[in-house]
Amino acid sequence: DKLGDDLSFDEQNAAGDASTCSTICTTFVTNDYDRILGNATAALQAASASTDSIPILGTSITDYATALDMSDWSGTTGKNISGTTDLAPLDEQAKCIKELFPDAKNIGIIYCSSEPNSIYQSTTITKYLEDEGYTVKEYTFSDSNDVAAVTQSACDASDAIYIPTDNTAASCTEAINNVASQAKKPIFAGEEGIAKGCGVAT
């Protein structure tokens, strides 16, 4: 005899487009699915906007309070949303940067300005890096077209670079690496995928 339930899955890829995310989630709700899994911030936000009754699970979400624009955060959403987070221990990463680059003075942070989770990470780790004695400056790009130029600006003015967990940066590691390696500037990444593509550590 078979044990358990027969499950069917409907996997849709919005390719990072917010309007496509909304269309997909509306279809899921219309089809009265039992669960919705939102992978990354845009998908979670679209799912949250589409239903307050179907249970939603989030994954690849750095900070739920930021993603869901919740000012009163107690560790749970208080609604039909739960899930996992990929937020790195930013205080420990700042200490690791100090261990790896003790002689550095200026740290540049590169991230996509349209990703709320990246803004949150940059703001948070900046405080920890300043506590370690670094001068920190943010270098933001709006989309993948600006990545190389922004990386060059960061490399020109920084002794080392930090890149938080950032979807756009993760998809542009080759372009980032091409610039940073030419400039001989080390990159500390917020997560393993970016570290493999263009970083020296995470």
Predicted regions and their residues:
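An alpha-beta-alpha
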Residues: 1, 82-130
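Short beta-strand elements in bilobed, periplasmic/extracellular small-molecule ligand-binding domains
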Residues: 2-21, 80, 126-144
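Beta-alpha junction/loop-to-helix N-cap segments that form part of ligand/metal-binding clefts
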Residues: 11-70, 166-190
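Extracytoplasmic/secreted proteins, especially bacterial periplasmic and envelope-associated proteins
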Residues: 20-23, 27, 31, 42, ...
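Conserved acidic residues
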Residues: 34-36, 105, 159, 199
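Short beta-strand/turn micro-motifs composed of small residues
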Residues: 58-60, 85, 108-111, 189-191
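Short beta-strand elements at the ligand-binding edges of bilobed clamshell
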Residues: 67-96, 196-202
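Pocket-lining segment of extracytoplasmic ligand-binding domains
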Residues: 116-185
